[in-house]
Amino acid sequence: MANTFNPEEDFPEVYKVCKLFNPSIDDLEKIKNAMDREITMGLSRDHHDRSTVPCHLSYVQDLPTGRERGQFLALEMMPTNCRIMLVKFSSERDIYTSSKCVIMPHTVAAGRGTEVFTFLATSIANFVKEKKVDKDNLPLGIAFAFTLKKLALDVGILVSWTKEFGAQGAIGKDVVQLLRDALAKFPEISVDVMGIINVGAGSLLALCWAQPDTRIGLIMGSIANSCYVERVERCETYEGDEYRKLMIINSDWAHFGDTGQLDFIRNEYDRQLDTESINPGTRIYEKFSGALCMGELVRIIVLRLMKSGAIFAEDRRDYIGIQWKLDMVSLIEIVSDPPGVYTKAQEVMDKFRIRHCKERDLAALKYICDTVTNRAAMLVASGVSCLIDRMRLPQISIAVDGGIYRLHPTFSTVLNKYTRLLADPNYNFEFVITQDSCGVGAAIMAGMAHANKYKTDAKLFTMDY
């Protein structure tokens, strides 16, 4: 018979530590209200630069209805790979996609900025020829996972790459124009780059085509971010025409807490993670809720408890002592066993050369993992409920992309529970998984932008306003 344990009685030192990770409803309400104030500042012309939730304009001001038709290209630019997609909208709720992943050689990624985009343009040209659409006029949208300063739908100034890219020559330049210039070297194809969006906006648009009430995109992976649909009248930093009433906003809420808004719930383990990170003092909200940080936080707690003799007292600590060694995949494996079973937890500890563990210690490990991920879900719920209440819509769908939501056995349940507790009960919502959908969203954006640009001509994309 499998053993079950009472944390308070069976591993009291662990229980005492985990109590530090249990925010109250009042705490979560306080976080929600602080988030709302920071969003209001982020949208403000006068206070934008002082906000930890800067609310960048996406310049996407149309939402799909599901009745649009046509074929388009998308380019997904991610830290580890790029993907080119041909997306066809042929009938209601029916999307056909054909794609090809391209791995950029390190010499190209580390070279001049123009080399990166020449490589991408060459890959796009080869792709459309392979798909026998090289004679077609193809609008293209870019889904971009790197930091941009957006100045228009089709103007995105590159602020920084991640560590996988070293092409410093592209920093400070317009990504869209760099790709347009590279594609101009292939006059035999007709590809029109219409704009650039981030991953969250892409996920939002992709789900919105199938579920037109979609108004939030939530990224729950190694990075933590969200986007939502705001009324243009609230977007004081927008200086364009206001005849379109909506704007997708990239919250960039990872930095929420950078000026102390979350200090009241931070504990010594949170502070250690922050101090030892590559960016101490910044991206505080992400350090509560990002997948990488959850695994690292568990590792810090376990190592501290091992040193005190509370758990795994006689086991080696050299492997688990390595920073970032316990990743989200391992964390999910630890909690995936049914109650009273610790097979997966032992398999994970085997990787750290911690073998033949006592069930009590493995139960404590699972309890720590559950505690850390539950708190992360609660804090994300504070942010999501803030967005829901700001929009004041009777029903919305929320596009969620990220392995922690999709694969963790309880994260989605906790997130749903606390979002319902925190949001105004008059507003209904539904979380919907949208795995790897940002390219489809970029294609939709390209289609809508093309339709708006060529309103007087024959449209490739049939819009329904």
UniProtKB/Swiss-Prot annotation:
Region of interest (Hexokinase large subdomain), ranges: 198-436
One MF term in the entry's GO annotations: glucokinase activity
EC number: 2.7.1.1
InterPro entries on file: ATPase_NBD, Hexokinase, Hexokinase_C, Hexokinase_N
Annotated PROSITE patterns: HEXOKINASE_2 (PS51748)
One of the record's GO cellular component terms: cytosol
Catalytic activity line of the entry: a D-hexose + ATP = a D-hexose 6-phosphate + ADP + H(+); D-mannose + ATP = D-mannose 6-phosphate + ADP + H(+); D-fructose + ATP = D-fructose 6-phosphate + ADP + H(+); D-glucose + ATP = D-glucose 6-phosphate + ADP + H(+)
Ligand binding (ATP): K88
Region described as Glucose-binding: 139-165
Disulfide bond positions: none
Location of the Hexokinase domain: 8-447
Location of the region described as Hexokinase small subdomain in the Swiss-Prot/TrEMBL record: 65-197
Keywords (A to Z) from UniProt: ATP-binding, Glycolysis, Kinase, Nucleotide-binding, Transferase
Effect of N33H: In strain: HFL97e3_12 and ZIM(S)e3_24
GO annotation (BP), single: glucose 6-phosphate metabolic process
Pathway: Carbohydrate metabolism; hexose metabolism; Carbohydrate degradation; glycolysis; D-glyceraldehyde 3-phosphate and glycerone phosphate from D-glucose: step 1/4
Enzyme superclass (EC): transferase
Function of the protein: Catalyzes the phosphorylation of various hexoses to hexose 6-phosphate.
Family of this protein: Belongs to the hexokinase family.
PANTHER family: HEXOKINASE, HEXOKINASE TYPE 1-RELATED
Protein name according to UniProt: Hexokinase type 1
Taxonomic source organism: Drosophila melanogaster (Fruit fly)
Gene name linked to the record: Hex-t1
